[in-house]
């Protein structure tokens, strides 16, 4: 098993994994047609933009060249939390859930953010994503705000969660 920072050449594989994870993790939240319409090419463009500006590094976790999960993090993009570090994405392949890979990625990203000088960390999560909310609660995050998320022509409730005052 290996954890490392992603490089430009890894972004296509990360984009494909992200779409794969959305399709299984959000199948009861988003419309099937919307999930199937997502393109790896479109995801790749978004990941590439974050990679190019250096504000959204990816930590990758894999085994023998197979990407099992990744975590994106950096400065906060969440309105109202400009001084926080943010975990912007964490996805683990479905058959790798429950093996500690998500925990390893998540805690490493937190450590990196703290090392960059952030005291508080923020993230957002779909309100219906009970598995993720339980994961974040177990890592010390608390819900601090509600917001809406637009995707595929619909609005979805989201929770903003925060972990405060790391010294």
What would you call each of these model-derived segments?
Residues 1-3:
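Extreme N-terminal starter segment of soluble prokaryotic enzymes
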Residues 85, 119-133, 138-139, 145-167:
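C-terminal "cap" of GNAT-fold acetyltransferases
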Residues 99, 115-119:
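Short coil/turn segments at alpha/beta junctions that flank glycine-rich nucleotide-binding fingerprints
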């Amino acid at each position: 098993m290996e954890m490392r920072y992603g490089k430009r050449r890894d972004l296509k594989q990360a984009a494909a994994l992200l779409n794969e994870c959305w399709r299984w993790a959000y199948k009861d939240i988003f419309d099937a047609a919307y999930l199937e319409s997502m393109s790896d090419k479109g995801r790749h463009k978004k990941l590439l933009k974050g990679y190019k500006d250096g504000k959204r590094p990816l930590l990758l976790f894999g085994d023998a060249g197979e990407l099992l999960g990744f975590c994106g993090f950096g400065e906060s993009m969440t309105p109202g939390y400009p001084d926080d570090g943010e975990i912007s994405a964490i996805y683990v392949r479905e058959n790798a859930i429950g093996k500690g890979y998500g925990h390893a990625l998540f805690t490493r990203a937190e450590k990196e953010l703290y090392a960059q000088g952030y005291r508080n960390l923020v993230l957002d999560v779909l309100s219906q994503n009970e598995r993720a909310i339980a994961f974040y609660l177990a890592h010390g995050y608390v819900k601090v705000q509600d917001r809406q998320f637009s995707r595929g022509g619909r609005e979805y409730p989201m929770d903003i969660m925060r972990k405060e005052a790391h010294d």
